[in-house]
Amino acid sequence: MKVSVLITLAVWGVMFLLTSAQERGSDQMDSPAWLKSMERIFQSEERECRWMFGGCTTDSDCCEHLGCRWEKPSWCAWDGTFRK
């Protein structure tokens, strides 16, 4: 009997924590300030270069020693150089 009461109380506690965390998270996700800050983070960070066979539009999209090949679809390929 004591074990079943303890298990029931533990389950209620876990359910309370999960539901309160979900409610708190949904309030934060709907706020426009949160969305604006995330937008600023993604705009301000420097973009990585594209690796071999990655999609590209210009040579500057590709990593060093790679160039954008214009066949459809465009992709980054080795430009034939060995320099560092």
From Swiss-Prot:
Any Pfam family the entry gives: Toxin_12
Annotated compartments: Secreted
Superkingdom as given in the UniProt entry: Eukaryota
Cellular component GO terms, alphabetical: extracellular region
Tissues with expression: Expressed by the venom gland.
InterPro entries in alphabetical order: Huwentoxin-1
First and last residue of the signal peptide: 1-21
Keywords: Disulfide bond, Ion channel impairing toxin, Knottin, Secreted, Signal, Toxin
GO molecular function, one term: ion channel inhibitor activity
Disulfide bonds, paired cysteine numbers: 49-63, 56-68, 62-76
Propeptide: 22-48
Domain free text: The presence of a 'disulfide through disulfide knot' structurally defines this protein as a knottin.
Its biological purpose: Probable ion channel inhibitor.
Similarity comment: Belongs to the neurotoxin 10 (Hwtx-1) family. 06 (F4b) subfamily.
Stated name of the protein: U2-theraphotoxin-Cg1b 1
Organism annotation: Chilobrachys guangxiensis (Chinese earth tiger tarantula)
